[in-house]
Amino acid sequence: MASSGLSSRRSIMASRLTASAEAVNEPRRGAVVSRRVEYDEESLAGAGGESRYEVFINHRGVDTKRTVARLLYDRLAQAGLRGFLDNMSMRPGDRLEERIGSAIRECTVAVAIFSPSYCDSEYCLRELAMLVESRKAIIPIFYDIKPSDLLLPQAVADSEVYLPRDLERFKFALREAKHTVGITYDSATGDMAELVSAAADAVMYNMEKMETVQRRETMILSRL
């Protein structure tokens, strides 16, 4: 019965994603994302109050916030999935680390958008380390970089700002991401609509897989 419900939900999500595909084509020429449609976080959460975030979007804002990160957030919202994107999901007065940490713990799937300046960002690295340590399903998008480019910059490694254990956490998280099958995108030749569609499909696939595993674990525990 649970399997039937999950399949039904995936079918609904897929139909919504298909119906919204044309919206992604609009910004293909440039970096500015259409703001005609805004999503109210509270309406996505439902009348009963805030629900948990299902998808965490880890990204370097200066590289991808106004393109793939925002487009993917919109696409998931149209499919009825509640994604966490910092500038869309946080409100004045929120404590940054608490809000982000809570969203990471709640999510089922994360999308990590690796871009040229990603590894220069402390926030990106800390979020990635938390996602890996929380054993979340992570979908890498290699945006204008190759997996082999995921290395801790020497400036970060030599900095006295970070504790040795933090540097090890960052290195481990980057290694894990490097060896995870992801989506590669070249902004000079790629199709943004295809990228967002592939990322949304990957989110649905991984959510179904994680929910199946959780359901099996619950069944096993109930028999003990």
Curated annotation (Swiss-Prot):
Annotated site residues (Important for ADPR cyclization) in this chain: 123
Superkingdom as given in the UniProt entry: Eukaryota
Keyword Hydrolase: yes
Alphabetical keyword list: Hydrolase, NAD, Plant defense
Keyword Translocase in record: no
Function per UniProt: An NAD(+) hydrolase (NADase). Upon activation catalyzes cleavage of NAD(+) into ADP-D-ribose (ADPR) and nicotinamide; NAD(+) cleavage triggers a defense system that promotes cell death. In addition to ADPR, also generates a cyclization variant of cyclic ADPR termed v-cADPR (2'cADPR). Also hydrolyzes NADP(+), but not other NAD(+)-related molecules. v-cADPR activates ThsA, an NAD(+) hydrolase in B.cereus (AC J8G6Z1). Probably makes 2'cADPR; the cADPR made by this protein is bound by cmTad1 (AC P0DW61) and activates ThsA from B.cereus.
Assembly notes: Homodimer.
Binding residues annotated for NAD(+), in chain numbering: 60-65, 93
UniProt xrefs under InterPro entries: TIR_dom, Toll_tir_struct_dom_sf
SMART domains in alphabetical order: TIR
Notes on the domains: The TIR domain catalyzes the NAD(+) cleavage (NADase) activity. In contrast to classical TIR-NB-LRR receptor-like proteins, only contains a TIR domain.
Name of this chain's protein: Probable 2' cyclic ADP-D-ribose synthase BdTIR
GO molecular function list: NAD+ nucleosidase activity; NAD+ nucleosidase activity, cyclic ADP-ribose generating; NADP+ nucleosidase activity
EC number, UniProt record: 3.2.2.-, 3.2.2.6
Substrates-to-products reaction catalysed: NAD(+) + H2O = ADP-D-ribose + nicotinamide + H(+); NADP(+) + H2O = ADP-D-ribose 2'-phosphate + nicotinamide + H(+); NAD(+) = 2'cADPR + nicotinamide + H(+)
Catalytic center residues: 127
SUPFAM superfamilies: Toll/Interleukin receptor TIR domain
